[in-house]
Every structure is written in structure tokens, then in C-alpha cells.
Design a protein with these regions (language model features):
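Short, charged, solvent-exposed linker or helix-capping segments at domain edges/interfaces
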Residues: 132-140
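A general secondary-structure signal for short beta-strands and their flanking turns/coil
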Residues: 43, 56-60, 99, 117-119, ...
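Short beta-strand and beta-hairpin "edge-sheet" elements
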Residues: 90-133
């Protein structure tokens, strides 16, 4: 069993499964991993070729649906949910193991209106080919660890927070794709020489910049969205020019990824790692 929903840019949602009164799903194509383009090169008399690189093509989801009941009304409702290609729609898919979504643009919506059983076929092109998990995971890195939770009952004193000289956290990439992440930094005092490390890969990203109380840092390492910005008193400052030498756009390998950070004034900054698992197919 599976659930298929579509959301348009206005936030309207339609479920095409489990609604036999109005719609019947004939088929859904493009749910598994899209084809890859393999780039190779040949050399002299060497048999075969040498691998250079590879990339996944765009995902093409094709939904074939039969409108029931008020056939004309339900067909016209599809026009509203599947917008013209100038605005995106979001496809939600859920099965036993995964609840995911992907954004795309409607390429075609066509059908034969004069068949005894009218069938509508919708083709959606997804420029970014990976399915995204519906759950966003937030992992905190701080020298001060919160220990106070509700509800509680105590008979002897307990710590409500704890200081650690070497903040560390583990992020688990449970998807099947190496992915980026969004790094948030909230500054409450003078902080400089900020370095954020992925101990698993041995890579880091850092900034030669003096941060001050109230600063909000956002570093995006997602493919196609690379950026490093600072929000200070309503003004956005591009931090790209302040990247420390040797900095890399940190990625999440499959499985465990161990993170830590260091800075002068490290007690005055909290780092939050925002991650979403990505999948090649459902």
C-alpha cells in the first residue's frame, strides 16, 4: 500500500489514493532511481574506456489516473492542483518504509476526453532528482549542554546544564545519498576564529571574521544552494570572502558523521546542524 498526494504552490492538497469515489490510480512511474549519465574517455589502443564522472538526470514522474463520480469536475480539479509549469508543485509519497517529498514542474496534463473510461496522464519534471525525507533533524553543538527537562521530580540536586570543553555531536545520514546540510550559528558574545569540523571526513569550514552578540550565521552546503551568510541587525552580510583557508563545503557521508567546532569565545555560540535524509528512490 502507498499514499500519493500533490500540493500546489497555493498550499492546496489532493490525495489521489484511497479516494475511490473520485480517483483511481492506474500507474505511477519515476519513483525509483532516475537514469545516470556516465562520462568516459577512450585512450589509444586500450580496450574499453576510462570513467571520468557521472550525474543523475532529472526525475520524471508520470501519474496515470482515472476520474470517477463527477468526471468533468474531478478532471478540472486536477487542473488546479497540477499548475502550469511556471509554478512548482510538491509530490508526497509514503509507503511502509519511507515518507518523502519532491518538488517538480508539470510538463503535460493530457487525456482522451471521449473514451468510455476517461484517463488522465500527468508528467512532472523534477530538476533536483532526490526524494527528501519529511522529517528534518536538528542536532545541537554547544559548550553548554542542557540537562533540564519537563516533567521531573527530584529528591537530591541535579545539574540543569553542563559545560564541555570539546563539544561534539553525531549526525547519522540514514538516506542512500551523500548530502549537504544547513549550519546555523547563534552568537551571544564576541566570537572569532570559528571552525566547524566533520571529524569523520577530516574536513572543516571556518571564517576569519569577528562575530558579535546577536549575530545569526547560516551556512548552506546543499548541492545547488551553496552559501554562507550573516544576519546582523537586519542586514545580510555575505561571508564567502571571509572563508578560512582550506575550507570545504561539509557533506554527510552515509552512516555516522561526527562534528565538533572551535572558536575564541566558543562558550558564546551555539551551532545547530539541520539535516534531511535524501533517497534515490522509494
Amino acid at each position: 500500500m502507498f499514499t500519493l498526494k500533490i500540493e500546489n504552490a497555493a498550499g492546496a492538497v489532493i490525495e489521489l489514493t484511497h479516494d475511490r469515489k473520485n480517483y483511481g490510480i492506474i500507474s505511477v512511474q519515476g519513483l525509483t532511481r532516475p537514469p545516470a549519465q556516465i562520462n568516459t574517455a577512450t585512450a589509444g589502443t586500450v580496450d574499453g574506456a576510462f570513467y571520468n564522472s557521472a550525474r543523475l538526470e532529472m526525475r520524471n514522474i508520470v501519474i496515470t489516473v482515472v476520474p470517477f463520480g463527477d468526471i468533468e469536475g474531478n478532471r478540472q480539479r486536477l487542473y488546479d492542483i497540477f499548475p502550469l509549469p511556471h509554478t512548482p508543485c510538491t509530490v508526497y509519497f509514503e509507503n511502509k518504509n519511507r515518507s518523502v517529498k519532491i518538488q517538480g514542474y508539470v510538463e503535460t496534463l493530457e487525456g482522451d476526453l471521449f473514451q468510455n473510461r476517461e484517463t488522465i496522464q500527468v508528467s512532472i519534471i523534477c530538476p533536483r532528482p532526490y526524494w527528501q525525507d519529511l522529517t528534518t533533524i536538528y542536532t545541537e553543538l554547544s559548550q553548554t549542554l542542557a540537562r533540564f527537562e519537563f516533567p521531573f521530580s527530584i529528591t537530591e540536586p541535579i545539574p540543569i546544564s553542563e559545560y564541555t570543553e570539546y563539544p561534539a555531536a553525531t549526525v547519522i545520514n540514514s538516506g542512500d545519498v551523500i548530502s549537504g546540510l544547513v549550519i546555523h550559528g547563534s552568537v551571544t558574545g564576541a566570537v572569532s576564529g570559528l571552525m566547524i569540523y566533520n571529524s569523520t571526513s577530516g574536513q572543516y569550514i571556518g571564517f576569519d571574521y569577528a562575530f558579535q552578540s546577536g549575530d545569526e550565521i547560516t551556512v548552506n552546503t546543499l548541492s545547488g544552494s551553496l552559501s554562507a551568510r550573516l544576519l546582523r541587525q537586519g542586514q545580510i552580510i555575505n561571508l564567502m570572502q571571509y572563508l578560512a583557508s582550506g575550507s570545504k563545503w561539509l557533506k554527510l557521508a552515509l552512516g555516522e558523521n561526527n562534528f565538533t567546532f572551535a572558536a575564541d569565545g566558543a562558550e558564546d555560540i551555539t551551532i545547530t546542524l539541520e539535516t534531511v535524509n535524501l533517497y534515490g528512490g522509494v
